[in-house]
């Protein structure tokens, strides 16, 4: 389980109320924790470029349809709720995600 991996999260919490893919954004150095910080995906089409990062389905991501990362729904879930690895986000998409998170969280300045 590494930063940039896409897993299916079991149904838990307000934004993971149904099984859905999530992107692991937590640094790999914290792999001993019981929980992991993720950004959930949605297939709903919302025109909010700062809050939704559109990801095309590819064999590498394992996504079956165009999906968007919900930048405004960062959450922490138990590692045990991540059922299986779906794929991995491309480095270019990870950079886009990191930039959006910096802006959303107010870290970018």
UniProtKB/Swiss-Prot annotation:
User: EC number(s) per UniProt?
Assistant: 3.1.-.-
For the null mutant, the annotation states: The mazE-mazF operon is not essential. A triple TA mutant (missing vapB-vapC, mazE-mazF and phd-doc TA systems) survives antibiotic challenge, suggesting the TA systems are not required to generate drug-resistant cells. However the mutant is more sensitive to oxidative and heat stress, and does not survive long term starvation during aerobic growth on complex medium. There is a difference in the level of branched-chain amino acids, which may play a role in monitoring the nutritional supply and physiological state of the cell.
Xref: SUPFAM superfamilies: Cell growth inhibitor/plasmid maintenance toxic component
Induction line: Constitutively expressed during exponential growth and early stationary phase, it decreases in late stationary phase; part of the mazE-mazF operon. Negatively autoregulated by one or both of MazE-MazF.
Keyword terms, alphabetized: Endonuclease, Hydrolase, Nuclease, Repressor, Toxin-antitoxin system, Transcription, Transcription regulation
Tell me which InterPro entries the record gives.
PemK-like, Plasmid_toxin/cell-grow_inhib
Superkingdom to which the source organism belongs: Bacteria
- What GO terms in the biological process aspect are recorded for it? mRNA catabolic process; rRNA catabolic process
A GO molecular function for this record? Answer: DNA binding
User: What is a single Pfam family found in this protein's UniProt entry?
Assistant: PemK_toxin
Matching PANTHER family, A to Z? ENDORIBONUCLEASE MAZF, ENDORIBONUCLEASE MAZF-RELATED
Q: What family does the Swiss-Prot or TrEMBL record give for this protein?
A: Belongs to the PemK/MazF family.
How is the quaternary structure described? Forms a complex with cognate antitoxin MazE.
Question: What this chain does, per the record?
Answer: Toxic component of a type II toxin-antitoxin (TA) system. Upon overexpression inhibits cell growth and colony formation. Its toxic effect is neutralized by coexpression with cognate antitoxin MazE. In M.smegmatis 3 TA systems (VapB-VapC, MazE-MazF and Phd-Doc) may be involved in monitoring the nutritional supply and physiological state of the cell, linking catabolic with anabolic reactions. Probably an endoribonuclease.
What is the protein named?
Probable endoribonuclease MazF
Species per Swiss-Prot/TrEMBL record:
Mycolicibacterium smegmatis (strain ATCC 700084 / mc(2)155) (Mycobacterium smegmatis)
At the highest ranks, the source species' classification is: Bacteria, Bacillati, Actinomycetota, Actinomycetes, Mycobacteriales
């Amino acid at each position: 389980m590494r930063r940039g991996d896409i897993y299916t999260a079991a149904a838990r919490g307000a934004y993971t109320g149904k099984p859905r893919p999530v992107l692991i954004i937590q640094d790999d150095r914290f792999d001993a924790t019981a929980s992991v910080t993720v950004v959930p995906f949605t297939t709903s089409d919302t025109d909010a470029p700062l809050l939704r990062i559109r990801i095309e389905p590819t064999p590498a991501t394992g996504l079956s349809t165009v999906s968007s990362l919900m930048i405004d729904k960062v959450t922490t879930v138990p590692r045990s709720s991540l059922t299986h690895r779906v794929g991995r986000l491309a480095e270019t998409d990870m950079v886009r995600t990191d930039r959006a998170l910096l802006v959303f969280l107010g870290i970018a300045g």
